[in-house]
Amino acid sequence: MEMQSVTHHVSGAMPAPLRIGRAAPGRCCILAWLAFIALPHGVLAQDLSANTRLLAAARAGDQTGVGKALADGASVNARNRVGETALVIALKNDQPTLAMTMLNAGTDVNLGAVNGVTPLMAAAHAGQTDLVRLLLGKGAEVSAVDRLQKNAMTYAAGQGRTDTVVLLLRAGVDPNAIYAHQLTALMWAAGYGKTETVRALLNAGASAELRDDRGKTALDIAREGNFVETVKQLESPARP
């Protein structure tokens, strides 16, 4: 999805549930097939039936089925036709227990889907802060970007996942980092009217003076979205 205005930059750029980086018609199928035939870590040499059952169980949120498939030899890094591992599927579907199972089984925490969505991005989007913390501890790449040049911080900020945003800041993410279209995390939060997240970012040193590639500040973006409380927060010199 291209982002050509503030509305498209922010509000229209993160539909829910997690739908990120769709390719043009035709390309998607080709990319998905290439991802399937290039599965890493020797997946094709293993029991494809067990792999298929693992992914189906993950999609259904079936903890028992996941455990059985793993016991039967399924690869922890098996991926479906769009390149999603059971871990990514679990995180997208808000199945933290299942996600923990896959993490404990040794799934590659940086193995993303065809669209580039990594486990950390999926967890950040869902606001699964404990899992974000665990992923970071296991070496998840915090600066990884997907096909739309978005990352864990932009997803967390846009979704108003304040606890996750604070955790990412503590992990070393610059509150004034510039992302695609010269957007900052503050702009993403402002564009969705996430006042609490805006406040947390301001308190962490995020600048309200930065401008995107249209010359708009976070305040301008909040005004365009008619987010009254967010506008008040950005206008206020005191930010309790």
List each language-model region with its residue ranges.
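N-terminal segments that cap or nucleate solenoid repeat domains
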Residues: 46-85, 89
